[in-house]
């Protein structure tokens, strides 16, 4: 079966884990190159041992590799600031490249596979939001398909040890991009995102809490929609699960909640508690936050590649 070649820009935790996933499980994709800026990085050393072409000279080095002309997909696992420069540079050389953006740059449309992948199959650049967004936006969208969502707030708690320099450099972009995507894809009128780097030792796996305030709705229908969505996410992130039963609170008109920017609102408050365990391909199992990003990005590119090969 013909496979499309990919390059991964960023040889840190996310880029290296993504490379391992493609090497082990790529169905329509195969590795073409791993790109970094640190010649001593573990990711580049590992890639070289596995027979993958490497460069420590960034996207300029990628463009000079003999196989650059055969690359169909580029995964960018650098930083938001770097991606804003990488996209026009690469597209200037190869206009037809597909870029999968794993930074919070959001040059292209947000993509959460279980919610809106099919709408984005032909996009030249898609943004994978953030780890917190990939974990929680499906839950907001699950409530949205049952009732109108006024407000959604998510809290993503990740092990401090799983947050590399790229994640730490993008904390502000994380909250901004996730909040916007909660609205754009999740369907909330207003979204808010909070990230917590948990320093506990031994490290704890990723935990996410989702609070949704919606119009009044049938609780059984909401719970069923959430369970169905969680199962869909498990299709590409097996370690994704509801940690406990969904909790509901009816907010009466007589005692509404005051939501900044929206005013006083009543309705149904839904609380969802998630945990995400990583597949431990390259990263430890507690780094579910990184695993859900690489898994979502791979699922997106695989579906795009399938569509391109079948065209």
From Swiss-Prot:
NAD(+) binds at residues 11-14, 162-170, 289. GO terms for molecular function: acetaldehyde dehydrogenase (acetylating) activity; NAD binding. The active site is at 131 (acyl-thioester intermediate). Its EC number is 1.2.1.10. SMART domains: Semialdhyde_dh (SM00859). Keywords: Aromatic hydrocarbons catabolism, NAD, Oxidoreductase. The keyword Oxidoreductase applies. The keyword Oxidoreductase applies. It catalyses: acetaldehyde + NAD(+) + CoA = acetyl-CoA + NADH + H(+). InterPro entries: Acetaldehyde_dehydrogenase, Acetylaldehyde_DH_C, NAD(P)-bd_dom_sf, Semialdehyde_DH_NAD-bd. It comes from the Bacteria. CDD domains: ALDH_C. GO terms for biological process: catabolic process. Belongs to the acetaldehyde dehydrogenase family. This is Acetaldehyde dehydrogenase 2. It comes from Azotobacter vinelandii (strain DJ / ATCC BAA-1303). The gene is mhpF.
């Amino acid at each position: 079966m013909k496979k499309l070649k990919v390059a991964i820009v960023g040889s840190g935790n996310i880029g290296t884990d993504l490379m391992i996933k493609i090497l082990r499980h790529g169905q329509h994709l195969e590795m073409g190159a791993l790109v970094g800026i640190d010649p001593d990085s573990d990711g580049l050393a590992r890639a070289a041992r596995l027979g993958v072409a490497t460069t420590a000279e960034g996207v300029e080095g990628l463009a000079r590799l003999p196989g650059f002309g055969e690359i169909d997909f580029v995964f960018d696992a650098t930083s938001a600031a770097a991606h804003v420069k990488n996209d026009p540079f690469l597209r200037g050389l190869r206009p037809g490249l597909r870029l999968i953006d794993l930074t919070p740059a959001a040059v292209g449309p947000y993509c959460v596979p279980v919610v809106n992948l099919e709408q984005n199959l032909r996009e030249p650049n898609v943004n994978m939001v953030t780890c917190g967004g990939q974990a929680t936006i499906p839950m907001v969208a699950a409530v949205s398909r049952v009732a109108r969502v006024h407000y959604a707030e998510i809290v993503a708690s990740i092990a401090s040890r799983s947050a590399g320099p790229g994640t730490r450099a993008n904390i502000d972009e994380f909250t901004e991009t996730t909040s916007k995507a909660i609205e754009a894809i999740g369907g909330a009128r207003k979204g808010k995102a909070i990230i917590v780097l948990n320093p506990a030792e031994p490290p704890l796996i990723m935990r996410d809490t989702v609070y949704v305030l919606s119009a009044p709705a049938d609780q059984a229908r909401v719970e069923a929609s959430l369970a169905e969505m969680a199962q869909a996410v498990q299709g590409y992130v097996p370690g994704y699960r509801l940690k406990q039963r969904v909790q509901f609170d009816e907010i009466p008109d007589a005692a509404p909640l005051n939501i900044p920017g929206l005013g006083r609102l009543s309705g149904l408050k839904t609380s969802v508690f998630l945990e995400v365990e990583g597949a431990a391909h390259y990263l430890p199992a507690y780094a579910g936050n990184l695993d859900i990003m690489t898994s979502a990005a791979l699922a997106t590119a695989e579906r795009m590649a399938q569509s391109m090969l079948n065209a």
